[in-house]
Swiss-Prot record:
Residues 520-557, 576-588, 595-624 have a biased composition (Basic and acidic residues). Component of the outer dynein arm-docking complex along with ODAD1, ODAD2, and ODAD3. Interacts with ODAD1; this interaction may facilitate the recruitment and/or attachment of outer dynein arm docking complex proteins, including ODAD1, ODAD3 and ODAD2, to ciliary axonemes. Interacts with components of the IFT complex A, including IFT140, TTC21B/IFT139 and WDR19/IFT144, and the IFT complex B, including IFT46, IFT52 and IFT57. Interacts with CFAP53. This is Outer dynein arm-docking complex subunit 4. Keywords: Cell projection, Cytoplasm, Cytoskeleton, Repeat, TPR repeat. PANTHER family: OUTER DYNEIN ARM-DOCKING COMPLEX SUBUNIT 4, PTHR23040. It is found in: Cell projection, Cilium; Cytoplasm, Cytoskeleton, Cilium axoneme. Transmembrane segments: none annotated. GO terms for biological process: brain development; cerebrospinal fluid circulation; cilium movement; epithelial cilium movement involved in determination of left/right asymmetry; heart development; lung development; mucociliary clearance; outer dynein arm assembly. It comes from Mus musculus. TPR repeats lie at residues 11-44, 46-78, 79-112, 273-309, 318-351, 358-391, 395-428, 435-468.
């Protein structure tokens, strides 16, 4: 990879791209993306685990194991790395070593993945005990995991008295063991029995067992830890029984053939049972292509047989179609997988096989959900509801239906099914499903903007996550809780903002009304003030005229003017008074005809100016 390629993107971008390609089944491209990410951030344990998963899907088991071990190099307690190493070892056929790491991870964090891993590893070991040649266990002679286990428990084992861990001879070890014979021990341990013998021989070397290792433990303590572990595992494997339904179904099928034919299983029956085991083993080990080819080959042969040779031929054919469909899902052949599972469903309906019908509906719903057709998945799974028998099955079913409704943004239905799943999970007492159901309900309530209820359910989910020690779920829930709380704050802000806007609008309306009322009251007031000012000016002018007239009359009387002139002067004075009265009358009319509350101030101004003009005119006339 060139420097230019490295700089073109970032570590999170390559990680996201790799995860998307992994989900799409493009494992080669996903590996390249994860490799690019590791160039940017060397040794990132999450990236190494992600690339290991891709190698495992492609069947490159050595590279898958190398990446898983590399993820544990700096942090031996990294649970994802432990789980991935266990899965890789299981796929490689090292069931005992896989079981060791499943148990180690379960002690660190009791998650469902480790629990299921323990169960399937136990079943694989039990299935191999009957015929050890069916599974080849690789005897690497590497007991380093025992020393690591001892070192990790230094605080607990360091101060234990050696007498509690020691046995004097090889014969005492055998007497203390719970197994009845060496033959049984050899059969249960398989090729690990060689390691047990080797450890027992080491105990005979007195000089060796007195030595100590860096952690402070003696070699004898370390050897006895390994022997005790193998003894415990032997008892455990001997007592355990197969748990998966497929094993029970195969045995029930064999018993049915025995009842129908009333004779020992024929070569045909052995062939079918062995073939079903091989098909299932190939699929679980990551070889979906091999599983598909095997199932198609067996189906072709079974279809050639008659009903007498295989009494439950129809049930077997449906089972094979189901196996073919499951392999096609893993290969990404969704259309073909849907056809195969529908054939399984048709056979189940035709021959009234409720368990087979439930299985087919389950698988058809899975196909629809994988391709994003959530409504069809809902319809299919809702048809399966009456066939669900156990509380745990109902819990899972309602959760998946609710998840599909959530994907369709139908939050009410998602909440309803989530609450049903929550109820059945509580009845079952399964903390993992209580966690899943609570998260589903909370997510639906967030979409419904019921943030308060969502916070309550997220808090409930957080409690369950703490109880099952799921740190990743805790972090995700805490983040979702923060978002829900922010949603509550935003809702409060929006509510307050709407209240503020409404109050502001109301205040503006009130102020506008007050302004209009004040303006209307001021307009006539201005008119009256102007009128009074003009009238007062006119009265002052009249007073001046009267004084001037009186002075003139006095002068004329003293000057011996004629009566005619006196009469003319009086007439002139009367004329002036008439004009004054006319002006006063016009002013009175003006006062009575003042504009109403909605009149304009400009018009009042013009009328006042006109009145002033009349007064000035009168003054000029008087002077003349």
């Amino acid at each position: 990879m060139s420097d230019g390629d490295i700089l073109r993107s970032t570590f999170p971008s390559y990680m996201a791209e790799g995860e998307r390609l992994y989900l799409c089944g493009e494992f080669t491209k996903a590996i390249q993306s994860f490799t690019n990410a590791l160039h940017l951030q060397s040794g990132d344990k999450n990236c190494l685990v992600a690339r290991s998963k891709c190698y495992l899907k492609m069947g490159d088991l050595e590279k898958s194991l190398n990446d898983a071990e590399a993820s544990l190099r700096n942090d031996p307690t990294f649970c994802k790395g432990i789980l991935q190493k266990a899965e890789t070892l299981y796929t490689m056929g090292d069931f005992e070593f896989a079981l060791v790491f499943y148990h180690r991870g379960y002690k660190l964090r009791p998650d469902r993945e480790f629990k299921v891993g323990i169960q399937k590893a136990q079943e694989a070991i039990n299935n191999s005990v009957g015929s050890p040649s069916s599974i080849k266990l690789e005897n690497k002679g590497d007991l380093s995991f025992l020393s690591k286990q001892a070192e990790s428990k230094k605080a607990q084992q360091k101060h234990l008295p050696i007498k509690q861990l020691s046995y004097s001879t090889k014969h005492e070890i055998k007497r203390k063991g719970s197994l009845k014979s060496e033959k049984t021990v050899r059969q249960l341990l398989g090729e690990l029995y060689v390691d047990k013998e080797y450890l027992e021989k080491l105990l005979l070397d007195e000089d060796l067992i007195k030595g100590t290792i860096k952690s402070g433990l003696t070699v004898e303590d370390l050897i006895m830890t390994g022997i005790n572990y193998l003894d415990t595992r032997s008892n455990f494997w001997r007592q355990q029984k197969p748990i998966y339904a497929r094993e029970r179904d195969r045995k029930l099928m064999q018993e049915k053939w025995l009842r129908d034919r009333k004779r020992s299983p024929s070569q045909t029956a052995h062939y079918i049972l062995k073939s079903l085991e091989d098909i299932d083993m190939l699929l679980t080990s990551g070889s979906a292509d091999g599983s598909l080819q095997k199932a198609e080959k067996v189906l072709k042969k079974v279809l050639e047989w008659n009903q007498e040779e295989v009494p439950n031929k129809d049930e077997l054919v449906g089972n094979l179609y189901s196996c073919i469909g499951n392999a096609q899902i893993e290969l990404g052949q969704m259309v073909a997988a849907l056809q195969s599972h529908r054939k399984d469903l048709e056979i189940a309906k035709e021959h009234d096989l409720p368990d087979a019908k439930s299985r087919a509906l389950d698988n058809i719903g899975r196909v629809f959900a994988r391709v994003g057709k959530f409504q069809q998945a809902i319809d299919t799974w809702e048809e399966k509801i009456p066939l669900a028998k156990t509380t745990l099955e109902k819990t899972w079913l309602f959760h998946e239906i609710g998840r599909c409704y959530l994907e369709l943004d139908q939050a009410w239905q998602a909440q309803s099914y989530g609450e049903k799943s929550q109820q059945y999970a509580e009845e079952e007492g399964d903390l993992e499903w209580q966690l899943n159901a609570s998260v589903l309900v909370a997510q639906a309530q967030v979409k419904l903007r019921d943030f308060e209820s969502a916070v309550n359910n997220f808090e409930k989910a957080l409690e369950r996550a703490k109880l099952v020690h799921n740190n990743e779920a805790q972090q995700a829930i805490i983040s979702a809780l923060d978002d829900a709380n922010k949603g509550i704050i935003e809702e409060l802000k929006k509510t307050n903002y709407r209240e503020i806007l409404r109050e502001k609008a109301e205040r503006q309306d009130i102020m506008s009304q007050m302004d209009l009322q004040g303006a209307s009251e001021k307009e006539p007031l201005r008119g009256r003030e102007e009128q009074e000012r003009v009238v007062k000016q006119w009265e002052r002018d009249q007073e001046s005229e009267r004084e001037a007239t009186d002075d003139e009359q006095d002068r004329k009387s003293s000057g011996g003017l004629s009566k005619k002139l006196l009469g003319d002067g009086h007439s002139s004075n009367l004329g002036i008074r008439r004009e004054s009265r006319e002006i006063y009358r016009r002013l009175s009319d003006y006062s009575s005809h003042l504009p109403s509350e909605d009149g304009s101030q400009k018009q009042e101004k013009k009328q006042a100016e006109a009145a002033k003009g009349e007064v000035q005119k009168l003054e000029k006339t008087k002077e003349e």
